[in-house]
């Protein structure tokens, strides 16, 4: 699915160099089809890096995807130029009267911060409540999963004593589920979180269906039966080098981090890591776009009435 973005967005050239199909707005205007409108609420500090990661995963299917980037934190960014934010991001007030086919809420490095201490917690609540009536399907990633479980289901924050960092094996629980269609029986995916997601907690306190778990019994992928919300507790969007960057950052900060599990060859941080989860990440996002967004979203977005099974 070629992603449709503004011609000047830095990700255009970056992804084209990787042979990723990116369609600029000027080119897309010549195709007589309705693109899927996908809103990305980017909560990560390094916004350009995160844009590249998610746009890469949204790009590999025959339909157009019209991407809109959203920010809700008005504070000055230390990691992203103000010019970039002003040129390519909208504020919630700019889009609150619109409807979208899909919404992705990214992770955020807030695993040890209490919800009420998050500077934009009221805005997070506002967006999630708004999405119920304005978005066909929402995908939450890592910290956003924890935030959504609290806001939508009242589940208190669950925190691990140590950070889960590395590339872990998972297994699917429902081979015929649409979101896991085409998955291998077991697959690898990266995690980088303090948040804890025991599968028993999800089963006991929500009506969500767990579709894949870690080998340790943590919920990795789960969703509502009506496909309106989906959750992934890891980071399938990560580049090969992302965990390494986080590890060396923490080393320089004197935090004495554990070496990410099953990541560096021979467990040696001097060795260059490889991405062993790329096919999984691409298939997950393609399935979400197809089965959770495209197949149920209304053609006319002015009338938000998803087609439910």
UniProtKB/Swiss-Prot annotation:
Biological process terms in GO annotation: L-methionine biosynthetic process from homoserine via O-succinyl-L-homoserine and cystathionine
CDD domains for the chain: GATase1_HTS
Organism domain of life: Bacteria
Assigned EC number: 2.3.1.46
Keyword Cytoplasm: yes
Localization per record: Cytoplasm
Residues annotated as site: Important for acyl-CoA specificity: 111
Annotated pathway: Amino-acid biosynthesis; L-methionine biosynthesis via de novo pathway; O-succinyl-L-homoserine from L-homoserine: step 1/1
First-level EC class: transferase
Pfam families named among the record's database cross-references: HTS (PF04204)
This protein's GO CC annotations: cytoplasm
Residues annotated as catalytic: 142, 235, 237
Main location as per UniProt: cytoplasm
UniProt: substrate binding residues: 163, 192, 249
Keyword Cytoplasm found: yes
Transmembrane domains' residue ranges: none
Reaction it catalyzes: L-homoserine + succinyl-CoA = O-succinyl-L-homoserine + CoA
GO MF annotation, one: homoserine O-succinyltransferase activity
Family affiliation: Belongs to the MetA family.
Subunit and partners: Homodimer.
HAMAP family: MetA_acyltransf
Function: Transfers a succinyl group from succinyl-CoA to L-homoserine, forming succinyl-L-homoserine.
Protein name: Homoserine O-succinyltransferase
Organism: Salmonella typhimurium (strain LT2 / SGSC1412 / ATCC 700720)
Protein encoded by which gene: metAS
């Amino acid at each position: 699915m070629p992603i449709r973005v503004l011609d000047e967005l830095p990700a255009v050239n970056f992804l084209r160099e990787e042979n990723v199909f990116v369609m600029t707005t000027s080119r897309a205007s010549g195709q007589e089809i309705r693109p899927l409108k996908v809103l990305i609420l980017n909560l990560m500090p390094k916004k350009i890096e995160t844009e590249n990661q998610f746009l890469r995963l949204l790009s590999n299917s025959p339909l157009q995807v019209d991407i809109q980037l959203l920010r809700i934190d008005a504070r000055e960014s230390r990691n992203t130029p103000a010019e970039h934010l002003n040129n390519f991001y909208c504020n919630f007030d700019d889009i609150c009267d619109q409807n979208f086919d899909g919404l992705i809420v990214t992770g955020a490095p807030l695993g040890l911060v209490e919800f009420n201490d998050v500077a934009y917690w009221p805005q997070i609540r506002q967006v999630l409540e708004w999405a119920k009536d304005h978005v066909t399907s929402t995908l939450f990633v890592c910290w956003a999963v924890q935030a959504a479980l609290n806001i939508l289901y009242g589940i208190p924050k669950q925190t691990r004593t140590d950070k889960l960092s590395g590339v872990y094996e998972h297994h699917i629980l429902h081979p015929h589920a649409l979101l896991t269609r085409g998955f291998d029986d077991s697959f690898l995916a990266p995690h980088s979180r303090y948040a804890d997601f025991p599968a028993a907690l999800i089963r006991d306190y929500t009506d969500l269906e767990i579709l894949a778990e870690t080998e340790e019994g943590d919920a990795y992928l789960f969703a509502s039966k009506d496909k309106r919300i989906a959750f992934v507790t890891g980071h399938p969007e990560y580049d090969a080098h992302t965990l390494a960057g986080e590890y060396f950052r923490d080393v320089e900060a004197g935090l004495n981090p554990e070496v990410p599990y099953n990541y560096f060859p021979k467990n040696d941080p001097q060795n260059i890591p490889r991405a062993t989860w790329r096919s999984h990440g691409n298939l997950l996002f393609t399935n979400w776009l197809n089965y959770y967004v495209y197949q149920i979203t209304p053609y006319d977005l002015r009338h938000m009435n998803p087609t439910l099974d």
